Structures are given as C-alpha cells and as structure tokens.
Amino acid sequence: MITFDLETKSYADLTKVGAWAYSKDPTTQIICACYQIGDAPIQEWWPGKNADDSIPEDLRDALASGMLIEAHNISFERSMWMNVLTPRYGWPEVL
C-alpha cells in the first residue's frame, strides 16, 4: 500500500470552490508530497528542489507494480494528481 499526502497553496479558497475547481485553478501549487511505500520510511518530494520534478523512481515503480494508493482525503489528492502533478510535472495518470 502507498500512503500519499499533499500540501498545497492557492489563491482559490478550497472550502468555497471544492477540490476539483481548486486543483484546476492556475494559482494552485504543490508545496510538497509525502508518501510511504509499505513499511519503508516516509519520503518527501519538493517541486523545484529535485534533480528534476518527475515522479520519484520508487513511487513510479510501486504504482507500476499495481500497488494501491491510500490518502486521508483521496478525492483531493486524486484531483491534484490529475490536474497538477500529471500536466505540470509529467507524473503518470492514476485512475
């Protein structure tokens, strides 16, 4: 199991516009992503602070193996993944 969490910022008010509109707002940015694959240590990904901003190799491999993702607010994380991580950073699409 992959546990996944995002920290974000935006001029859009999440409580007023909802997760999908928030994730589509051009001012919405990802501050960092934290993830844990199984019992491995928690990893952090910070846009602009990596050799490149593509998906970390261990996370990509875990997804490719069919490992499931859990998140405390999965609709938010999924919206952000689909509308920010994939188009802006080239992360693979998730269902």
Task: Label the predicted regions.
Residues I2-F4, T8, D13-V17, T28-L95:
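Conserved DEDDh/DEDDy metal-dependent 3′-5′ exonuclease domain
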Residues A21-P26:
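Short consensus segments that form the blades of beta-propeller domains
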